[in-house]
Amino acid sequence: MGELAQQGVRCVALEASSHALDQHRLDAVNINVGVFTNLTRDHLDYHGSMAAYAASKAKLFRRTELTLAVVNGDDPLARLMLAGCTSNVRVLATGQDEAVTLRVLDWQAFEQGQQAMIATPEGEKMLSLNLMGRFNLDNVLLALAVLYGLGKPLDALFAAASSLRQCRAGWSAMVMPTRPALLWTMRIRRMLFIAHSKRCAPT
């Protein structure tokens, strides 16, 4: 971070891991925007329980310098994260719940991407992505909410999102000739993992 500051970088996106928050390794970093995607059963060897894991993550939203909090409103732990926010923190949410800022009204997946109708504070807008997997839609919506919260226009954000492309090292489509299902593949260190499109989790 120090080297980036010396190079003139003024804004950085980083993962505030539960370990870093718990061990105070981010105390010297000025974090203005906090984003919560979800919690899965990871790092329990360190935290001991999901409750302790969630409590560590929630520390991100108790920081006094925070001005914007963006959460996945469909995750039941979102309220826990927001409970520690001070009154000057603006809160935005994404998901399918009626109360969220960017709400998914309809969603369709295709062989090389997906499309969703999104209810926004400025009306309904179509979001087209060249990214596969529902998790990518969820992540893009969170990123759009962050930029919207920072003052960027929604129309420009939706247009920019449509130009995103899959990373070469990421997920790619593999259509089996004898099966109608669309599978996802990912190469990691010469190993091929196949995941069902419904969950997009390597097995």
Residue ranges and their predicted role:
Residues M1-E3:
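Conserved alpha-helical scaffold flanking the Walker A/P-loop in AAA+ ATPase domains
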Residues A181-R187:
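Active-site-proximal beta-strand elements of phosphoester/diester hydrolases
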Residues R187-T203:
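AMP-binding/adenylate-forming catalytic core of the ANL superfamily
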